[in-house]
Amino acid sequence: MFLLHEYDIFWTFLIIASLIPILAFWISGLLAPISEGPEKLSSYESGIEPMGGAWLQFRIRYYMFALVFVVFDVETVFLYPWAMSFDVLGVSVFIEAFIFVLILVVGLVYAWRKGALEWS
């Protein structure tokens, strides 16, 4: 037997948490003044006259470096709780964490060989 009524608070919270930003955007769209013109389309640089265009191209190598950083940053987030509760967890959790780290090391070696970690 499912006790779905126990989740009423969760569903209420989820609905309210979804409605608040939707209503905020909707109300600001109704009340905000609409102004169009060349000044609206120019880039804003803290009150200083813009020097050049707003579109700059970045090399793809920066994105690859950032992607590798994010992957290993997320790895740290996953490994920290495991390290803090290592003494109460069993051997199976240690093996799972070891496999997780091994997969990430394989990914690091792959990124290294492909040159994703090179700045030049």
Curated annotation (Swiss-Prot):
Location, primary (coarse class): plastid
One GO cellular component term: NADH dehydrogenase complex
Pfam families in the cross-refs: Oxidored_q4
UniProt membrane topology term: Multi-pass membrane protein
One GO BP annotation of this record: photosynthesis, light reaction
Transmembrane segments: 9-29, 64-84, 88-108
An annotated Gene Ontology molecular function: quinone binding
Domain of life, per lineage: Eukaryota
Database matches in PANTHER family: NADH-UBIQUINONE OXIDOREDUCTASE CHAIN 3 (PTHR11058:SF9)
Complex formation: NDH is composed of at least 16 different subunits, 5 of which are encoded in the nucleus.
Identification of the protein by name: NAD(P)H-quinone oxidoreductase subunit 3, chloroplastic
Lineage: Eukaryota, Viridiplantae, Streptophyta, Embryophyta, Tracheophyta
